[in-house]
Amino acid sequence: MLLRRLSIQWKITLLAGLCLLGVVSLLSGLSVYRTQHSTSLVKQSSTEMLNEAAQARLQSRGEVQAMRIQRYIMDAYQYGKGFSRQVLFLRDQAQKRFLDAYDLREDLTRQVKTALEGNPELLGLYVAFEPDALDGKDKLFAGQGELGSNDAGRFSIYWSQATPGHLESEAMAESLLQDTSPGPSGSAYNAWFTCPKTTGQPCVLDPYFDDVGNKKMLMTSIAFPLELDGKVIGVMGLDISMEKLQEIAVEGSQELYEGQGRVSIVSAAGLLAGHSADASKLSKKLQEVYPNQGTDLLQAIAANHEQVFHQDDQLRVVEPLQPIPGSKPWGVLLEVPQNVLLGPAIELQNELDNQSVQGTVSQLGFGLVAILIGLFAMWLTARGVTRPILNV
């Protein structure tokens, strides 16, 4: 009814306008769709690229941390390996020159002290022989601690320095050498003595707390077998502080995304030797600190293979390391929140979204202007066409 009341001019204008509106809307819609589709592809590919780059960066940081830890432990290992050879050399020379047993024990006690003084980073240094394996005269020196001899006369000297330069010594009693009570890792307390004796190979122990002087300190021990003709006749070992590893963990976390990451150092048995987030967790089992993923993380370390885990909005990278040759692997665990790690990707997505919205608004605006201009042009054209008819 309304159309019948319209003039020919407005009917032509309306029909042409509808056609123009349909064409412009179709072209604008197609343009908006293609723009959004292209933006989506760019967002996806850019996010994947930035995610891979961030993950690669985190893995490279893990390798750097692993190298720092390995270098620290290997320095102590090389020092201990050299000194263990020196101990065997002193024993050999004493036998060849028929050195008095008193002088040999006194000399060994002094050499252990001197070796510890020469390396202030060490907490302790010890030498313990099997019964009568040093000179065959243990009974003559029973209870002579000043000569490194314990209650049974066995040579078992331990020098310690809770503070560099302040040395204390003790002859380790038979009860201490035979203490098999389990520690936090499940190994016997005297693993520092029995491990190299049983395996015939150097051993690095899991972290444990022990008293050095009057201080309880977290440490680990590297123990070496003293072998003669293929038989282990004693053990030489050194204690190193885990404070340095904790420092490495804290420094490493500060370097991760401006301190927003976390670094942990894990022993072969899954005990924390370093934990930047909370020092009170040191010596705790990995499964206690990470109840949801601790077992998987420990399995990755045991497999000696770098792995990446995504859980609880966290990206975790496990980087294994071998503290000393032939030992079971330890590991470095790096953690970064996903939103921090993907910060650049999220910023790029937001920027692309903003540009997409602006582009869509601009296209729709230009389309609307084109429609209005087209309608006005159609109106003028219709007016020119219908004027002669109206004048008849």
What is each PLM-predicted segment?
Residues 107-115, 235, 239-281:
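Solvent-exposed, extracytoplasmic
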Residues 116-201, 207-214, 272-291:
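Extracellular/periplasmic ligand-sensing ectodomains of membrane signal-transduction proteins
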Residues 1-10:
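Non-catalytic regulatory/interaction regions at protein termini and inter-domain linkers
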Residues 215-252, 315-321, 327-341:
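Conserved beta-strands of PAS-like sensory domains
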Residues 193, 197-225, 257-262, 290-331:
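Membrane-proximal, non-catalytic sensory/regulatory domains of signal-transducing membrane proteins
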Residues 13-21, 25, 259, 339-392:
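Cytoplasm-proximal transmembrane signaling helix
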